[in-house]
Amino acid sequence: MDTTPTTLSRNTSSAVEEQHSVARTLVLHLLPGVLVLVFFLAVAPLVWGIGFPPVMAVYLASVFVVVPFELGYLIYQARKNGTSLGNIVLYRQPVPKGQLVLLVVLLFVGGSVLGALLLPVDFIVKENLFSWVPSGYDVTYGLYGDVARFSTTALLVMWVFGLPVNVIAGPVVEEMYFRGYLLPRISRFGVWAPLLNTVLFSLYHFFNPFGFISRIGSFLPMAYGAWWKRSIYVSMIVHVLFNFTTAVFILLLILGIFGGVPG
């Protein structure tokens, strides 16, 4: 796959080192998602068999697929080019603390609202296009409903395991890979680059196709924030907050705060 090299100084606000071809862009955005899907399809029945919801397979995929592949690819690129990881992962411009806090709050709230407004579309898509997906492969099963199918102990073990994996490690590595590596290398698309990056990022979640639309709504403001400020620290914090908020909500469901106490 061809790339077009240009010049890059050590300052990440400078010109991008290379521009990926469309083919390479598609492959690098979607390949990790394909690998996660294969892992998920293989492991979901196993975790189901020992009493865990399907999402436990996603958390395991973060450990055995997402982090090793995405971080490993970045390290490989650094070694291949005889440079440091810092020259591979771009968009690392510092943002003044006050601006950072304000921007994070705005992007978090904005993304949360947009995602929530688009949730009904997800439900329509799920009912009309993916109603055939078995419960054992539905990542929402046992979280937002049917919690009685799983023991409280199993759900809490899953939640504790997912906290460092899905709230910290996964988002940090994904932001390094998607917004720090891939986004700068499609900068030739200008203002459309974050949109393309976000659509492909949402599609990369092949294991959860129902959430495609709302995921775009949630992550698009964040991607534009990182692109505008040339700082993955912005998107990294917002991404962590998204996943942390989801984790808190899931914990409340497990504990029966919103109804249905699990068995």
Question: What is each of the regions a protein language model found here?
Answer:
Residues 112, 143-263:
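Transmembrane helix-loop-helix hairpins at the membrane interface
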Residues 83, 115, 119, 123, ...:
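Short helix-terminus and kink motifs of transmembrane alpha helices
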